[in-house]
């Protein structure tokens, strides 16, 4: 089957609402909306392998550290794992006093009751329920007319209100979503939401959240903004409701749709870090927040160490962040074009520390989000980096991790600039040796003893420094953690990988590590040895020595 020459035979254009007096195009976003992360619910349910309890807790703590005050933590009536996770959050005291958890439930009494069971003992919680209102869902999925759909929303609301009253020690919030709002007749969405408002009787001091999802993105963002503004004009008790938006990215405009919706009156935005979520994903909260930041608006979220946040998200979701993802991708602050690099260099030369940011091609100062400038001003091209990686793999069996490829390409570029010549594979390998494998000062690893018992590793390493022998001892859950515990400086391991070089009895292990010393910038190290543990230790000392040497050079 091929694409139709006349797609109008199969597809119909979106029918916009009439709003000739729209006001949103003249609005400016001058403050952050209320943010809600649905990474642990919408994001988690879209993963090939949903997160286990350990990953969910790690992700939750990351969201709290970033500054999220509302976090949708699961769908407890649909998953025992989610139910148990909600209980652990509450019983384990993991929820800060200024953070409110939210859970999702369908509009069914048995599921609502199970949801309230999961929330027993919570200080504050939002119960979020939904039912689909769009014509296609009414006709195809549920075989319900408009009256039936509205009755479901009202009945479920009454059940939620009754069960909440039975648990008065919890400070309750309520959220209703007319699912697939973007494809629903807007006047009918208002009718259903007004009926829900009558159930909950919200006040300006105790507002009801009305979440208007673009469950499937079906039109240009301006149409969604029109729907939001029209809804805000016609919904009852506007001063007693929070209009929330939840955009997906089916047409690739989820960020724009959310931003225009806020201009149109939305108070609150739901999304995921780096845009995870069903199909093409939810709107990316990182992009939205940093878009505000680069307009001089405090986003109320902290991405000062964006790579650490990205590491948690990638580990938990098992999905890499695209190299071109706004703000967070490996390549977003890198210019390969010579003319771009020239403009960036001139911009840095003229940029004053306390001046308005005006460096060409860079909408944000990379340092604000924990990035350094080396990748920005490197002169190596993409093909050059790819060639370096290819030669090392083909000639020496060395497969550098992605971020290390970028770091080492800068080393190669500096050498080619110095020599003014093309470097051979042997010369590139010699440079790799001198930069990483021979990095033995100020600390040279002479040997180590490792004892492992009941999942605990104890290590004793002998180190030569300034001609004198020292012994460092540490204990941890594995050899590397034990070694880090014994170091005289603070080391944070950002990434670690390993592979075999060769096969059979002559095989060696190659270990790669990315770490930070004393909170400094991330650097890499390599270790190669017949023994994997030794290779990993050599990699750590390689990176450690490089970091300390560079810090000493900068201080000088």
From Swiss-Prot:
Any GO molecular function: magnesium ion binding
Keywords, alphabetical: Amino-acid biosynthesis, Branched-chain amino acid biosynthesis, Cytoplasm, Leucine biosynthesis, Magnesium, Metal-binding, Transferase
Cofactor(s) needed: Mg(2+)
Known EC number: 2.3.3.13
Binding residues for Mg(2+): 42, 246, 248, 282
Subcellular location, record wording: Cytoplasm
Main location as per UniProt: cytoplasm
UniProt xrefs under SUPFAM superfamilies: 2-isopropylmalate synthase LeuA, allosteric (dimerisation) domain (SSF110921), Aldolase (SSF51569), post-HMGL domain-like (SSF89000)
GO CC annotation: cytoplasm
Residue ranges of domain Pyruvate carboxyltransferase in the record: 33-307
InterPro entries, per the entry: 2-isopropylmalate_synth_dimer (IPR013709), AIPM/Hcit_synth_CS (IPR002034), Aldolase_TIM (IPR013785), IPM_Synthase (IPR005668), LeuA-like_post-cat (IPR054692), LeuA_allosteric_dom_sf (IPR036230), LeuA_N_DRE-TIM (IPR039371), PYR_CT (IPR000891)
Region of interest (Regulatory domain), ranges: 439-556
Pathway: Amino-acid biosynthesis; L-leucine biosynthesis; L-leucine from 3-methyl-2-oxobutanoate: step 1/4
Complex formation: Homodimer.
Matching NCBIfam families: leuA_yeast, PRK03739.1
Function: Catalyzes the condensation of the acetyl group of acetyl-CoA with 3-methyl-2-oxobutanoate (2-ketoisovalerate) to form 3-carboxy-3-hydroxy-4-methylpentanoate (2-isopropylmalate).
Family: Belongs to the alpha-IPM synthase/homocitrate synthase family. LeuA type 2 subfamily.
Protein name: 2-isopropylmalate synthase
The organism of origin for this protein: Ectopseudomonas mendocina (strain ymp) (Pseudomonas mendocina)
């Amino acid at each position: 089957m091929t694409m139709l020459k006349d797609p109008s035979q199969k597809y119909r254009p979106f029918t916009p609402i009439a709003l000739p007096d729209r006001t949103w195009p003249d609005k400016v976003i001058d403050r952050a909306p209320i943010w809600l992360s649905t990474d642990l619910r919408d994001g988690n349910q879209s993963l090939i392998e949903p997160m286990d309890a350990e990953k969910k807790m790690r992700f939750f703590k990351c969201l709290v550290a970033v500054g999220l005050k509302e976090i949708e933590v699961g769908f407890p009536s649909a998953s025992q794992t989610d139910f148990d996770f909600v209980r652990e959050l509450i019983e384990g005291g993991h929820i800060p006093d200024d953070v409110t958890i939210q859970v999702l439930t369908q509009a069914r009494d048995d599921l609502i009751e199970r949801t309230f069971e999961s929330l027993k003992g919570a200080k504050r919680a939002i119960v979020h329920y939904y039912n689909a209102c769009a014509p296609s869902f009414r006709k195809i999925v549920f075989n319900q007319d408009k009256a039936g759909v509205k009755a479901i929303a009202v009945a479920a609301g009454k059940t939620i209100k009754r069960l909440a009253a039975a648990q008065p020690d919890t400070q309750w919030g309520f959220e209703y979503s007319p699912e697939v709002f973007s494809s629903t007749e807007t006047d009918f969405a208002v009718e259903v939401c007004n009926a829900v408002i009558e159930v909950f009787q919200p006040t300006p001091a105790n507002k009801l959240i009305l979440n208007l999802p673009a469950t499937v993105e079906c039109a240009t963002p301006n149409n969604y903004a029109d729907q939001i503004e029209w809804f805000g004009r016609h919904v009852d008790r506007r001063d007693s409701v929070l209009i929330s938006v939840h955009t997906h990215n089916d047409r690739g405009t989820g960020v724009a749709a959310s931003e225009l919706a806020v201009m149109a009156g939305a108070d609150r935005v739901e999304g995921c870090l780096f845009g995870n979520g069903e199909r093409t994903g939810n709107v990316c909260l990182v992009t939205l927040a940093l878009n505000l930041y680069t307009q001089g608006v405090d986003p109320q979220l902290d991405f000062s160490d964006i790579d650490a946040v990205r590491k948690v998200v990638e580990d938990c979701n098992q999905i890499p962040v695209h190299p071109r993802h706004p703000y967070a991708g490996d390549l977003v602050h890198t210019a390969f074009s010579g003319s771009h690099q020239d403009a960036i260099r001139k911009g840095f030369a003229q940029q004053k520390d306390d001046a308005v940011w005006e460096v060409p091609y860079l909408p944000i100062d990379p340092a604000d989000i924990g990035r350094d400038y080396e990748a920005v001003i490197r002169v190596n091209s993409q093909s050059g980096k790819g060639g370096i990686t290819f030669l090392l793999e083909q000639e020496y069996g060395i497969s550098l991790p992605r971020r290390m490829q970028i770091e080492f390409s800068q080393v190669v570029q500096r050498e080619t600039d110095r020599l003014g010549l093309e470097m051979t594979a042997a010369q590139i390998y010699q440079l790799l040796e001198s930069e990483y494998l021979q990095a033995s000062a100020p600390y040279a690893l002479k040997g180590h003893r490792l004892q492992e018992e009941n999942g605990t590793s104890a290590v004793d390493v002998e180190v030569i420094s300034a001609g004198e022998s020292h012994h460092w001892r540490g204990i941890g859950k594995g050899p590397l953690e034990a070694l880090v515990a014994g170091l005289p400086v603070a080391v944070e391991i950002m990434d670690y990988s390993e592979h075999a070089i060769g096969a059979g009895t002559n095989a060696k292990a190659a270990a790669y590590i990315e770490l930070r010393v004393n909170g400094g910038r991330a650097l890499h190290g390599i270790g190669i040895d017949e023994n994997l543990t030794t290779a990993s230790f050599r990699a750590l000392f390689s990176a450690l020595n490089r970091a300390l040497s560079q810090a000493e050079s900068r201080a000088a």
